[in-house]
């Protein structure tokens, strides 16, 4: 049965993003509500977001199983990827196609992300890298940027205790210096509080550029050469990899990349790290990406023969 709630005082997005009524009654579609519990979204900072109760994106604590969970029969544990990277694309288009405010597209996307993390945790994935905000996203309307910053802030505050309790480690890759100071402080707190956890490592790419990641690694190596610590002939791919921002994880190169919404590009994400990654492009918008779609991606991955540039056997 569809779930409805009131959205009060919709934030003033430009007309091209959404309409601006004072009160809208929204139907959350049955196929989405069956997968995850419905909760309202909290307002973002700077009064830029919709006034949806933040429980809309709260964690269903019963969904995390700290014991080993049997895999779906279609999957082999021996062939599971250790590290999955995700470009969570399509939140805005999902909302627009339904005549909903963009804020609800992101809210639905966060609910789906929670389910995705739950499944990854229960199915034994070791690392997730999530493309949350690119360095190019600053060019979006200020109201939308403020919304996203507020969402990052709210989710971190709400989930820090759960992350620590369930053994999930959080790391941030990207240039955090441009984020709001309060968000930077919260990120530092969350990273420190979870750094000893090892059940699942979640890397969130915020203000991230794959090109700049390589550039900053080269700058660091160049400085080491200048300081006389290494010679130019010491530079190799392993040394570069050790200076990339994904050096914080045990598995810096993803085994599988999933991109939703039917777009067939990398969008400046993990350009070095994806050299031998298997790619899976889903036609589903991110808010529609559920367990069935995740299972399809994993089955596709397990049917492939990874050659890393070599010949097939």
From Swiss-Prot:
It holds the Pfam family Prenyltransf. GO terms for molecular function: ditrans,polycis-polyprenyl diphosphate synthase [(2E,6E)-farnesyl diphosphate specific] activity; magnesium ion binding; prenyltransferase activity. Its cofactor is Mg(2+). Residues 1-42 form a transit peptide. The keyword Ion transport does not apply. It is an enzyme of class 2 (transferase). Its EC number is 2.5.1.87. It is found in: Plastid, Chloroplast. Keywords: Chloroplast, Magnesium, Metal-binding, Plastid, Transferase, Transit peptide. It catalyses: n isopentenyl diphosphate + (2E,6E)-farnesyl diphosphate = a di-trans,poly-cis-polyprenyl diphosphate + n diphosphate. CDD domains: Cis_IPPS (cd00475). GO terms for biological process: plastid membrane organization; polyprenol biosynthetic process; response to cold. InterPro entries: UPP_synth-like (IPR001441), UPP_synth-like_CS (IPR018520), UPP_synth-like_sf (IPR036424). The active site is at residue 89. The keyword DNA-binding does not apply. One of its GO terms (cellular component) is chloroplast. Expressed in leaf trichomes, stem trichomes and old leaves. Expressed at low levels in young leaves and flowers. Belongs to the UPP synthase family. PANTHER family: DEHYDRODOLICHYL DIPHOSPHATE SYNTHASE 2, DEHYDRODOLICHYL DIPHOSPHATE SYNTHASE FAMILY MEMBER. Catalyzes cis-prenyl chain elongation to produce the polyprenyl backbone of dolichol, a glycosyl carrier-lipid required for the biosynthesis of several classes of glycoprotein. This is Dehydrodolichyl diphosphate synthase CPT5, chloroplastic. It comes from Solanum lycopersicum (Tomato). The lineage of its organism: Eukaryota, Viridiplantae, Streptophyta, Embryophyta, Tracheophyta.
């Amino acid at each position: 049965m569809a779930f409805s709630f009131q959205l009060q005082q919709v934030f003033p997005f430009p007309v091209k993003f959404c309409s601006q009524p004072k009160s809208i009654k929204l139907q959350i579609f049955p196929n989405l509500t069956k997968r995850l519990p419905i909760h309202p979204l909290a307002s973002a900072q700077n009064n830029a977001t919709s006034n949806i109760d933040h429980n809309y994106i709260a964690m269903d604590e019963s969904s995390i199983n700290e014991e080993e969970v049997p895999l779906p029969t279609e999957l082999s544990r021996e062939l599971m990827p250790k590290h999955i990277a995700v470009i969570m694309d399509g939140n805005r288009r999902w909302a627009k196609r339904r005549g909903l405010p963009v804020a609800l597209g992101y809210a639905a996307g966060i609910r789906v992300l929670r389910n995705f993390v739950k499944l990854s945790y229960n199915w034994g994935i070791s690392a997730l890298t999530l493309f949350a905000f690119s360095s190019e996203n600053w060019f979006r309307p200020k109201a939308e940027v403020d919304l996203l910053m507020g969402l990052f802030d709210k989710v971190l505050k709400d989930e820090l205790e759960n992350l620590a309790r369930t053994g999930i480690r959080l790391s941030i890759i990207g240039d955090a210096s441009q984020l709001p100071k309060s968000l930077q402080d919260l990120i530092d707190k969350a990273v420190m509080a979870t750094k000893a956890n090892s059940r699942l490592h979640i890397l969130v790419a915020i203000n991230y550029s794959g090109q700049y990641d390589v550039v900053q690694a080269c700058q660091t190596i160049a400085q080491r050469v200048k300081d006389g610590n290494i010679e130019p002939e010491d530079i190799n791919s392993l040394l570069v990899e050790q200076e990339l921002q994904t050096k914080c994880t045990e598995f810096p190169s993803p085994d599988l990349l999933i991109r939703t919404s039917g777009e067939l590009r990398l969008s400046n994400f993990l350009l070095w790290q994806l050299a031998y990654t298997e790619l899976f492009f889903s036609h589903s918008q991110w808010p529609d990406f559920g367990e069935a779609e995740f299972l399809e991606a994993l089955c596709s991955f397990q049917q492939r023969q990874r050659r890393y540039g070599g010949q097939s056997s």
